[in-house]
Structure formats: structure tokens, C-alpha cells
């Protein structure tokens, strides 16, 4: 499908033919949900931990004799039912990551790109370069493009001045094309791709 290209200043810069197999699919929410869940689970630290009966600092002596007191039978005070006792079936340090087939991840990325194109939330620019790393100048450019909450995907390397200027803008993320992912695409209102990023994505899914 034909798509207009613009410059950072909002001027017309021609057009590009987008591959329907990447940008023209009917988005599937189930694939997007699976991929986002996989990404967030993989990112989770999993450092939660509580102490078991073998780990807490408490005596293992029997609280009182077995018979004759009229009270219930108990062993050590480290049992979970007592104040200061251990935790039963508590969290342990573990990885929350789970597997997701590579083909499913690739398909989910294409559906995420298609979702932005379908919602008219996709912008293609010729390049993202600045002469200096001034945030004020970049903010003016984004104002012309109507960008306040966006993910910007550059080529294999992001221009240093552009990255420095965008770093100070809230709700603006900048990634090289090899770092593009479903979660970051969906969490921002707009997706901005450079011409180099479009070419790289089409080569990747060829």
C-alpha cells in the first residue's frame, strides 16, 4: 500500500510502498496479548523471597509438653500459624519467563505494525537527524507532526544528537530498528518509522 513520507519539519518527502504482509494485516488481539505477556514476564526480576521454617531464626524446641495442659498439640513456635513463625508456601526466587515460539513473536510484531497502520497512528519520516542535540528544536518539530506520545524507530543506528534531544521529552521513546518490539509499539499512541527502518523491516520479514 502507498504511504506518504514526511520530514521532521512536516514537509512532504514523497511516498513509499508498504508491504501488505507487514502493514496490512487484520490485527489479532490474542497474538498481541501473548507477546506482551511474554515480554513482561521475561523482564520480571523474580527476586521475591520469604523464609521457610528451616531458614528463620527461632528455636525448634517444643512449646510445651504434649499432654496434660489442655491446650492443642504443638511443636516448635516456628510453625506458620504462630506470630513470628515461617511462611507456608511463600514466594521463592525464580524466573517468570516462559517460552513463546519465534514464529509467533515475528507474527505478533507484524500484527502490531498493522494495528498502528490501521488506526492511522503510523508516520513514516525520511530521516531523524539533528544538527545539534537541542530538545527545544525537536519539540517544535514534534509539534508540527502532532507527536506527544510516540515510539520513534530509526535505522540500525540512531543519530546521537537526535537521541540526546529526545531523551528529555516525556512519553517519547527512541529505538534502533533492531530493538523494535510489540510492547513498546503498543504502549505509545503513535509509531514513527524512518525510511531506513521500513526497508530494514521489509528485509527482515522477506
UniProtKB/Swiss-Prot annotation:
rRNA-binding among keywords: yes
Keywords, ordered alphabetically: Ribonucleoprotein, Ribosomal protein, RNA-binding, rRNA-binding
Region of interest: Disordered: 49-79
Pfam families: Ribosomal_L4
Recorded GO MF terms: rRNA binding; structural constituent of ribosome
GO cellular component, one term: ribonucleoprotein complex
Gene3D superfamilies referenced in this protein's UniProt entry, alphabetically: 3.40.1370.10
InterPro entries referenced in this protein's UniProt entry, alphabetically: Ribosomal_uL4, Ribosomal_uL4-like, Ribosomal_uL4_dom_sf
BP GO annotations: translation
Function of the protein: One of the primary rRNA binding proteins, this protein initially binds near the 5'-end of the 23S rRNA. It is important during the early stages of 50S assembly. It makes multiple contacts with different domains of the 23S rRNA in the assembled 50S subunit and ribosome.
Subunit structure: Part of the 50S ribosomal subunit.
Family: Belongs to the universal ribosomal protein uL4 family.
Protein's recorded name: Large ribosomal subunit protein uL4
Amino acid at each position: 500500500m502507498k504511504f506518504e513520507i514526511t520530514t521532521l519539519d512536516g514537509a512532504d518527502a514523497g511516498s513509499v510502498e508498504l508491504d501488505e504482509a507487514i502493514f496490512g494485516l487484520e490485527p489479532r488481539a490474542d497474538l498481541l496479548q501473548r507477546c506482551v505477556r511474554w515480554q513482561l514476564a521475561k523482564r520480571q526480576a523474580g527476586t521475591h523471597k520469604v523464609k521457610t521454617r528451616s531458614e528463620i531464626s527461632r528455636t525448634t524446641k517444643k512449646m510445651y509438653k504434649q499432654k496434660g495442659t489442655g491446650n492443642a498439640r504443638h511443636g516448635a513456635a516456628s510453625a506458620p500459624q504462630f506470630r513470628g513463625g515461617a511462611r507456608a508456601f511463600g514466594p521463592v526466587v525464580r524466573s517468570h519467563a516462559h517460552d513463546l515460539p519465534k514464529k509467533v513473536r515475528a507474527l505478533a510484531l507484524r500484527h502490531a505494525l498493522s494495528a498502528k497502520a490501521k488506526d492511522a497512528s503510523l508516520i513514516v519520516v525520511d530521516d531523524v537527524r539533528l544538527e545539534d542535540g537541542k530538545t527545544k528544536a525537536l519539540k517544535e518539530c514534534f509539534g508540527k507532526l502532532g507527536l506527544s506520545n510516540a515510539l520513534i524507530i530509526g535505522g540500525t543506528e540512531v543519530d546521537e544528537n537526535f537521541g540526546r534531544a529526545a531523551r528529555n521529552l516525556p512519553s517519547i521513546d527512541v529505538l534502533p530498528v533492531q530493538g523494535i518490539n510489540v510492547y513498546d509499539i503498543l504502549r505509545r499512541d503513535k509509531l514513527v518509522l524512518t525510511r531506513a527502518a521500513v526497508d530494514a523491516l521489509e528485509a527482515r520479514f522477506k
